UniProtKB/Swiss-Prot annotation:
InterPro entries: P-loop_NTPase, Thymidylate_kin-like_dom, Thymidylate_kin_CS, Thymidylate_kinase. ATP binds at G7, M8, D9, G10, S11, G12, K13, T14. PANTHER family: THYMIDYLATE KINASE, UMP-CMP KINASE 2, MITOCHONDRIAL. Belongs to the thymidylate kinase family. This is Thymidylate kinase. Its EC number is 2.7.4.9. It comes from Mycoplasma mycoides subsp. mycoides SC (strain CCUG 32753 / NCTC 10114 / PG1). Keywords: ATP-binding, Kinase, Nucleotide biosynthesis, Nucleotide-binding, Transferase. Phosphorylation of dTMP to form dTDP in both de novo and salvage pathways of dTTP synthesis. GO terms for molecular function: ATP binding; dTMP kinase activity. GO terms for biological process: dTDP biosynthetic process; dTTP biosynthetic process; dUDP biosynthetic process. The gene is tmk.
Amino acid sequence: MFITFEGMDGSGKTTTLLKVKEELERLNYQVLITREPGGEAIAEQIRQIILDNKNRDMDAWTEALLFIASRNQHLQKVIKPALEKNIIVISDRFIDSTSAYQGSARNIGVDVVNQVQQIVLKNCLPDLTLFFDVSFSEAEKRMQIRGENSKNRLDEEKSDFKQKVYQGYLELVKNNPKRIKVIDANQDIDQVYNQAIKIILEKLKENEKRTSN
């Protein structure tokens, strides 16, 4: 099964991902956790270009295509091989990030970005996506705790950009209710984790029941 975690920076998705992996492994599932951009040697090199603070003058389409190129490398070399071995793959970001950040916030257009992604990625979709919905104030507070030195080029975007990203995510949730489930990420990390693991275990049971019939 292929699961993705989506949301604004500071939503707690990365911390929750690690806790979910620990619990699934306790239940004897094989789990691979990975991230985007990156998750593979070449994809990680592309990540450095995308997030480098020196590259502030990057064109919106250049940014989008770099994300998609990194994603395809990650998909072909890491995600697909793991899925073929029946390993549960959980990725910190995937296609919905590009739809929200570049399609919505960069004003390229979600439909156009998704058309390119469908061509390159051959319409590969996650089985389940969790959207970690957090308020701007809570996200900013968590980002400050992370420290100034951890900020990358996208972290430093202005609030109007982040608002567009958030609205882009809400539109994705609205248009993909079966695949994308919302997590209230304003709560403390244990409550956020409890929401996430409940949804994931239900999906796993659903898949196991379907394959056994």
